[in-house]
Amino acid sequence: MNAIQQKCRPKHQVLVLKCYPRTTKGAVDVKPNSSELSYLLYYAASRKSKFQKVGSFLEKKTASDVWRLRIGNVQVTLQILEALIEKNPKDLPLFAPSVLKILDLVLKSNDITMVESSTPTFEAFCANHDASSLFADQAYLKQYESIVRQYASLASTRRSPGKTTPSKPVAMRWRNTGLEAIRSVASSDALASVQGTQYDILVPMILENLWTDNEEFLEILLHRAHLEEKVDTDKLLLRRRTSVATVRTAEGGNEPNPIALSGSAMDVDKLAEEDIGVLAITCLKQIFVGPNRSQIHAATVALLKFIEERVNQDENVVKKSARTGRDSGWAIKIFGLISRWAPVQERYVILMTTMDTLVRMPLSDESMRHHIVWMAMMGALLRSDVNLIGLSVMDVLLALMQHMKRLVQLPGDPSGASASDMLLPGQPDPRSPTTIAASTAAQATAAARKELLERIQQTIGDLATHVYYADQISDMISAIIQRLRPSKSNSPGNTSPQGEKIDGQVASPEDSTVESLFSLTVAKVAALKAIKTILLVANPRTKMAGNLGLARNKVSISVWEGTQWLLRDPEGLVRKAYADAVITWLDRETVKGDLKAVDESAPNPRASIRYTRDLGKMDVSPARRAASSASTRREPKPTRLHFLNLIHVAIYDNALQYVDYETDINLLHVLLAKLVDRLGINAVRYGLPMIFRLQEDIQEVDAPIGKVRVGCLVHGYLWALTEKFDFENTLVGRAIHNEIIRRRSKHFWIEGVHVPPPLLELIGTPGMVKPQPKMPLNQIESEALLPFDDRFALIDSICTGYQESFASPPTSPAASPGRSFTSPILGSQMSGLSPHTATDDEREVPSRFRDQMYVEWTRDLVIAMVQAGSKSASLNGSKTGTTGTSRYANARLGGNTGSPMASQQNLRPYSQPAGKDTLAPQNNPLAKLRKSSLRSNATPSPASSGPIRSGVTSVDQLKMVLSGQVAPAVVRAQTSHGNGAGGLGADDSTDSLVSYDMTVSEMSFNAGSVTYTPSHPVPRPPSRSRSHSRERRAASRSGAESPGGFDQLSRSNSFGKSNGNGRTIEDGRHDRHDDDGVPPVPPLPSGVSSPPLPPSRDGKSPSPRSPSTQAPVLPPVSLESSAIRPAKTRSLKSRGRHSRSGSIPSAPAPHAMRPATSAGHGVVGGDSAFDLDALLLGIDTKDMQGTLGNVTRPVY
């Protein structure tokens, strides 16, 4: 019967059965007959229809063999399938379902030997499997997923196949078999297909075999995996180089491990664990090395789910070092490994997937640990040397800000403050178990919130580790600041100027929600700390290797525009965090080039040159050039920034508002000192006028200790100036330091105000009352704090120090410039002779800066100018006058003149005027702005009633004066514009093209008029005296007066002010002038004399003038002396022996002055004739040597 049955079998069955050798039951490692197998393969390949029949027959035989535990026959069956797949890979879809069915039968046998024998067959199947076959048949797809799931479950460390628990060696064999199958799946193309994704099954099994509490074990696995990869590569190269005729008798790679031979059972198990771990590392790497974005995304999601499960099981996946504060742990290690394995262009997918998972997960106190772990993983990846090319930094930043918003939305205290209960009447005892448990839970929740908030701000800073485009850091800081700005509907009700009002931006509803949340103190502090972290990370002290070749733009000052209101926040933590962020920016982002004076109002000559050059290159017609090039090629006008101006306003407000808190004064001192140190003259131009105003406002502080604190802030700033501009050894510097030493010796000083300033971390929380220092309050009330009033000498020292700091050594001694300044200050374009080179002009402090330091500062004035100056106004005025300059004029002329600090000389060393309104209009650059017709009927004021406003105002009249056709007095009477000869009314004309103003330095170095005694007080007579310039003005005004002239004059000249010590001092600031660029007065014809003045409107004849009170004869005008350009103040150190102080009218004839009346407005008598000889004797002819004589190019 058996023979008949064999003859009746189909041929393919006969060929298959001949492949099985004769073995006993239970035999293992059985191989098929080679010759019969070869014929079977030829038969199946030649007849394609036989593949399905062979597969069906093998299914039936395998089911029978598995049932009877014929392990040898099962092994032969699996080898036959492997040979069929490898010999005919293109025909695999024909019998692939039979292969999966046979594998399913083997896996369900739960026999470790048969399952281990199936892994080569499954590997061959995965290697030659066509992923497109999964799209067509859903039954086949489910069959494939079932096989993958069964193989993956074998690698689990928590459960084993079978009903009984296997021994440890057998369990390791099961895990190894499962990992081998997973590696086969990971290397197949089907894994990358949409239908073949099994990451939620494969990745968790791999990670289970890698899970450990010892990070060193992972390092060992990585090292061994690297060595095995190297060995495999060497084997591959060796096989390629081996000859076909070479017979290899032994394999050197399968040598036994000496530890397994000589070690104990524990050592063998440890070695087996390492082998499994190496295989798991290889499987995980195989998944992430593929250049498939969806594959990396799905695998990352599976990794995050596995970590979430471990956290739910109270596993410690992230550790924080108590010594260094760095994060470590299994999760961070694995996260870093997969990021390095992934292709460079796909690495960012890992971070973005983690960010999306973090945002989608509900944020509550129960899930706080998950958020902390994921945030730690993201931060560790961002701060590592792994470059995430393609990462959208701004998307991650905005997502982190959104997450911070969700955190502060949680009920309770979002700051993570202490939740300990206090002993209050009527509440349970906190030592009871219930209260202790509740308090402990509240403290743990608060600590978790605080840790998450800190990690969010640290992760935001870690985004700056790698720079992917030039403006990345600036954009990050700007985005954070934008969300800190309150909307107009809920802006804080402080009095600080709001930058967002200037910007004119309208907030969207979404932004309003975020802004309302960021109005919380904790959110503001966290955002500001994040800005500080960004700056610290972007500017490391030691450069990272990954950032050496990357360049970025520095964070400009424009990002801080409109943020000064944060310094005015009522919460001290916010004020400190804001100051800390600004100081960090100054330390890390500013360079030495930022110390150079930058005048944003000056024209850019390079722009015009480049524009002309580019216009010449355009091959178009001239008409088209004129029509189109101006709009397309011209550079935009730079935006005017007001941050430095407004931050000093906020400092001024804080100094007066928080005078009761010593920490606030220390904070302001550190901020001011850092501004001076890092920005130099660019910050001093705004800070110095504010400091002098603050010094005057000391009198308004009620508490004596408050006066001491504000005084410390003022002199601390002056101390910083002496150190920065290196003039501590000058008279001005010694005066400042002597006063500081005196105050410190008398304990009129607070700790923390010194240079260099203390670290901000050492300063306490602003707004917190500290223990009062031991100060002699009785001495504070009795002894005055001597202010510093030598403002002009201080500014000159600052300018000199600035010039010396940028001075470069000459190339040779012969090329060094001389000190004989023979050309006029205004210069002559005809002569072409200029004593200064281009480098000298660059080292000079711009005249605009000098003017701003001379300005009498007021808070309301600055705010008005900023609001109006966003269009065209500036601190130096404009050609036509603007709203900002008009407001300044109104505020300046209507200011308070009764400041007790406004003293010209207050009987102490180094005394110079520093009062509110002691700066004369002719010394005040802003008071000389050109007025429009709208201001022609203004109330008479000192700015419009002086001799400057009543001088020659037209070119024709100037020519008449110079030619001798008419006397200056006649011209003055003709240019009074309806106000009589005296000219005390409002002047509706513009400024004169040439004004006769003396410089401050001329007055201070005029030996005939001013005596400068630095070490002893100036003795004063009992009666009030007046300076020569004041007598000259009074005399000129008394020549012809309107009925209201005396009243206006008495209002504009206030005398008899007290210096705080009961002594009467004068307000003599009006003898200062800032127009130092006027050439010497040319000689007039000898026959010219001053005719009598015409009668005034009221019919009264004016009193004759003395020669010293005549209107000054004006010099010829050059193009550079017009009112369009601001006057340039000459440095004190730039003068030679021959000064122009002798050319002022008061110098040649000091005896011509007459004492003033007791009221200060008496009529000065004198000769009616014009004394030309005395005038000509006072002209310094050496001042015009080296020019074209006394004639320069006129404006006409």
Swiss-Prot record:
Instruction: Provide the protein name.
Output: Protein EFR3
* Compositional bias annotation for Basic residues: 1127-1140
Q: Where is the composition biased (Polar residues)?
A: 487-498, 819-837, 872-888, 898-909, 934-944, 1049-1062
Example GO CC term: the record gives: plasma membrane
Low complexity: bias regions: 806-817, 1036-1045
List, alphabetically, the PANTHER family matched.
PROTEIN EFR3
* Annotated GO biological process: protein localization to plasma membrane
| Taxonomic lineage from the root | Eukaryota, Fungi, Dikarya, Ascomycota, Pezizomycotina
